[in-house]
Swiss-Prot record:
InterPro entries: SAICAR_synt/ADE2_N, SAICAR_synth, SAICAR_synthetase_CS
Pfam families the record matches: SAICAR_synt
Catalytic activity of the protein: 5-amino-1-(5-phospho-D-ribosyl)imidazole-4-carboxylate + L-aspartate + ATP = (2S)-2-[5-amino-1-(5-phospho-beta-D-ribosyl)imidazole-4-carboxamido]succinate + ADP + phosphate + 2 H(+)
Keywords: ATP-binding, Ligase, Nucleotide-binding, Purine biosynthesis
Tree of life domain: Bacteria
One Gene Ontology biological process: 'de novo' IMP biosynthetic process
Protein name: Phosphoribosylaminoimidazole-succinocarboxamide synthase
UniProt record similarity statement: Belongs to the SAICAR synthetase family.
Annotated source species: Mycobacterium marinum (strain ATCC BAA-535 / M)
Length: 297
């Protein structure tokens, strides 16, 4: 159920976020406690998840120091009390129809592409790579931005050029990789590998490219404990992969290839997911989630 904010017009609902109009140039982006997996919004909430995602994004927007959509601090007076800590006032942008994915390691859909073709998004890779192999250099592996309920599809850089033009495509690739490297280097000093992540970008009225939506959250990134890393096996994680793994386990009883939605998450998976998200935030930021603003603080 979305927040009823009397001062702002509700514009759209995503899998996790709600969007409201603040004025002609600004929007209110509210992160809920919903969680999605395999293109379904699950019938379970992760307590405090929206606050954790917001705290993580705010930390990384400051760390990477790239032009972004933030139009005020997390305690901006334009943010209603009932969503404080899980909402941000942002600039209205023309969003670009490309998911900008950076990969430092081979896993997920990238691994499936590689096993089928020896390539990821048209990029040829050496033979013999396995689950969680580290790339010599991070890869830009874009995807389409699917509508709610549809699948994102990996695409080649040539297709990005066709979609947004050569100049903008190069900007997206270069900015994505620069931001990823800076954040991944920081995370490694905190004992965490950021295996991959995805960004969204938009253009302001002057055509400037701005980083938007969420960044480096456990919803949009794979976080692995560095001291447990070993290529060739599925890694333990501090991210949404934990939920995906349970859904495809015998315990859940769910057939991913069937036509039924996933079952609700059991209490122990909900609690463990919350703990993992908080641990990722605290380890990477060096901050206590207990000190983050908003209801529940």
């Amino acid at each position: 159920m979305r927040p009823q904010l009397s001062d702002y017009q509700h514009l759209a609902s995503g899998k996790v976020r709600e969007l409201y109009r603040v004025d002609d140039e600004h929007l209110l982006l509210v992160a809920s406690d919903r969680i999605s997996a395999y293109d379904y919004v699950l019938d379970s909430m992760i307590p405090d998840k929206g606050r954790i995602l917001t705290a993580m994004s705010v930390f990384f927007f400051g760390l990477v120091d790239a032009p972004n959509h933030l139009a005020g601090p997390p305690d901006d007076p334009r943010i209603p009390d009932e969503v404080l800590g899980r909402a941000l006032v942002v600039c209205q942008l023309e969003m670009l129809p490309v998911e900008c994915v950076a990969r430092g390691y081979l896993t997920g859909s990238g691994l499936l592409d590689y096993q089928a073709s020896g390539k990821v998004c048209g990029i040829a890779l050496p033979p013999g790579l396995v689950e969680a192999s580290k790339f010599a250099e991070p890869l830009f592996t874009p995807a389409t931005k699917a509508e709610l309920g549809d699948h994102d599809e990996n695409i080649s850089f040539a297709q990005v050029i066709e979609t947004v033009g050569g100049v903008r495509a190069n900007q997206l690739r270069d900015r994505t990789l620069q931001i990823y490297v800076k954040a991944a280097d920081h995370a490694l000093t905190r004992g965490i590998i950021i295996a991959d992540t995805k960004f969204e970008f938009g253009a302001d009225r002057d055509g400037n490219l701005l980083l938007a939506d969420e960044i480096f959250t456990p919803d949009s990134s794979r976080y692995w404990p560095a001291d447990e890393y070993r290529a060739g096996v599925v890694q333990n994680s501090f991210d949404k992969q934990f939920v995906r793994n349970w859904l495809t386990s015998a315990e859940s009883g769910w057939d991913r290839g069937g036509d039924q939605p996933p079952p609700p998450l059991p209490d122990h998976i909900i609690a463990a997911t919350r703990e993992r998200y908080i641990e990722a935030y605290e380890r990477i930021s060096g901050l206590s989630f207990g000190e983050w603003i908003g209801p529940g603080a």
